[in-house]
């Protein structure tokens, strides 16, 4: 398993990537949902239930996947959801 510090580093990288992507797609307020989508993708790729259960040898692979993650369909859906919520306020 990854160390707690490595798990925290992966989670921080996920949060940073989510903020970057929400800015790129002009989707304000979707950072948490985007982070969840990235986290889900990493979990599905590595076959674990939690980032903390990731094998130590997969740490670099997971970090690279977080850096490269950019799912247009997911981000478009998050943006349209954020736009709808903004209109209802």
Describe each PLM feature range.
Residues 1-89:
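A general nucleic-acid interaction/assembly signal
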């Amino acid at each position: 398993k990854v160390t707690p510090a490595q798990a925290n580093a992966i989670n921080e990288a996920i949060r940073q990537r989510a903020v970057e992507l929400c800015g790129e797609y002009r989707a304000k307020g979707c950072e948490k949902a985007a982070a969840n989508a990235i986290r889900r993708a990493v979990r599905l790729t590595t076959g674990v239930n939690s980032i903390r259960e990731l094998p130590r040898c997969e740490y670099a692979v997971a970090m690279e996947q977080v850096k490269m993650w950019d799912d247009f369909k997911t981000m478009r859906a998050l943006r349209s959801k954020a736009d709808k919520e903004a209109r209802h306020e």
